[in-house]
Amino acid sequence: MLPSTSLSSSMHGNGVLNSRDAARHTAGAKRYKYLRRLFRFRQMDFEFAAWQMLYLFTSPQRVYRNFHYRKQTKDQWARDDPAFLVLLSIWLCVSTIGFGFVLDMGFFETIKLLLWVVFIDCVGVGLLISTLMWFVSNKYLVKRQSRDYDVEWGYAFDVHLNAFYPLLVILHFIQLFFINHVILTDTFIGYLVGNTLWLIAVGYYIYVTFLGYSALPFLKNTVILLYPFAPLMVLYGLSLALGWNFTHTLCSFYKYRVK
């Protein structure tokens, strides 16, 4: 479920597993422990999870320094406490209900939108992105001298959650206060404000993702994860020149979903 360290580089003759095999051997147990804690709220540290959410905005490097500390104390990089995931889910539900209210949706339309956003936009897309990043990082970014190390899928999912939270707050919460009276007014100021919020949100996602993988000492060339900034800036400039309002497109898509 998480990046692992090595005690030996290969299978010994006496049958002892190398670190990569050992990590995979225990991954199932760690996943089971994590999922089991999802239903034990008293064991979750919500205060610490809230602290992480704050610092993902103000100083995301501090969040990943804590990941290093966890590796040293618990011998794992990924979170073993699902409190962050629970708080993120609450944020997602509340902000989606707010979207339904702003777009003047009925009760059942809002519930349908909520199910779409949670299970498709968050969980489905999150699983897809995490799996892609897990594959790419293990295939192309692991240092040659560190082949006994690997990025486990669970850590890739944690990085996605970290990067998704600022994007969620910007696009699903802050943006709500500007949608009807500014962003959807079909003026230059409208799509300037809306598209700038999209630029900041997606930029945050790219940057926090980069920090997550650059925090792993056995990966190389993680700077390539910043390359999407270039096409993002080009797309932003084109959207302003062509009058393409990203938020208007999103709202139309949400309304189409719940028909």
UniProtKB/Swiss-Prot annotation:
Signal peptide: none annotated. It is found in: Nucleus inner membrane; Golgi apparatus membrane. GO terms for biological process: protein localization to cell surface. The modification Phosphoserine is found at S6. Highly expressed in periodontal ligament and bone marrow, but not in gingival fibroblasts. GO terms for cellular component: Golgi apparatus; Golgi membrane; nuclear inner membrane. Involved in the cell surface expression of neuronal nicotinic receptors. Binds RNA. This is Protein unc-50 homolog. It comes from Mus musculus (Mouse). The gene is Unc50.
